[in-house]
A protein has these predicted regions:
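Non-heme di-metal
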Residues: 1-290
Length: 290
């Protein structure tokens, strides 16, 4: 069987429309609710994805579609990691056999998540391909170094999944949708184990190779920063997706690691605000109200 499958060769039928990060963030239907016109001191000023938003339906459906395509790629990525590398002690492009088994178990979890997500999307009135598929998750699973895959996929992107599932679980609760709430809670429990597994293996395999560990954690920060674009996720009410600190701690993140992610989210939000300010200034528009 072929090894090291490139992202350009992913098997997709005509229903799927693939996109890049820039195009995705420009999609007006993405889960980035507008701020309420109420006072910034009121609860209505939050940018969190809640059912009372006028664009809540499209935002939630778009986010659910993104979860579904992400689960497909997570399944493909876990399967590739189990197959691409020979069994060994973790050096010279090998991975411990026990890690192969863990990745195979994760692939089974992801297959179940795909089935759940497809049914949830149908439940929410979304057709496959209605929203574009961003293939960055599988791109992170294409590294020649299995430890970079653990850092980029299991810690960074599966970590983001913890934040997203927590937000969607809360959305289902507020919307009075027990199906959405239960399914998101079920998948969230799996994601915590996936991130914890990735964290544990990264530390074990790089225990005697601090340079390799530092490189992996640097790659993780690059991926985290990419998905912090525009402050989509963060601790403040200006971010639609909250940083799920408690679940990240359960998944093996240290307090310092969570703070680093939070700081990157704040920087990304500030960068987006500055981009908006410059764009409005160039267009001759008044600055946005504070």
């Amino acid at each position: 069987m072929r090894q090291f499958f490139p992202v350009d060769d992913l098997a997709r039928d005509e229903r799927f429309v693939q996109t890049n990060m820039a195009e995705r963030m420009a999609d007006p239907r993405r889960a980035q609710p507008e701020r309420s016109p109420k006072s910034s001191k009121s609860r209505g000023a939050t940018a969190r994805l809640t059912p009372d938003r006028r664009e809540a339906s499209d935002a939630a459906r778009g986010l659910m579609h993104g979860i579904m395509t992400g689960e497909i790629q997570a399944l493909e990525g876990a399967g590739r990691t189990a197959h691409d590398f020979a069994s060994g002690d973790g050096t010279n492009d090998t991975i411990p056999f026990a890690l192969k088994l863990d990745m195979a178990r994760q692939a089974w979890d992801e297959a179940r998540h795909v089935e759940i997500s497809v049914k949830l999307s149908d439940w929410m009135g979304t057709e496959l391909g209605e929203f574009p598929e961003n293939t960055v998750l599988f791109s992170a699973a294409c590294s020649d170094d299995p430890i970079l895959r653990l850092a980029g996929v299991n810690r960074a992107l599966e970590g983001l999944a913890i934040d997203v599932f927590t937000q969607m679980k809360e959305f289902g609760d507020l919307a009075g949708d027990p199906f959405l709430e239960f399914c998101e809670d079920w998948m969230l429990a799996d994601e915590v184990t996936h991130v914890k597994m990735g964290s544990d293996w990264l530390r074990r395999v790089t225990e005697n190779d601090p340079e390799r560990r530092a490189k992996a954690l640097e790659f993780q920060q690059v991926v985290d920063k990419l998905f912090s674009f525009g402050g989509l996720r963060g601790d403040t009410d200006e971010s639609p997706i909250a940083l799920a600190r408690r679940f990240r701690e359960l998944a093996g993140f240290s307090d310092d690691e969570v703070e680093i992610i939070s700081e990157m989210d704040r920087e990304a939000l500030a960068e987006r605000k500055e981009q908006i300010r410059r764009a409005r200034e160039a267009a001759g528009l008044e600055p946005e109200p504070a």
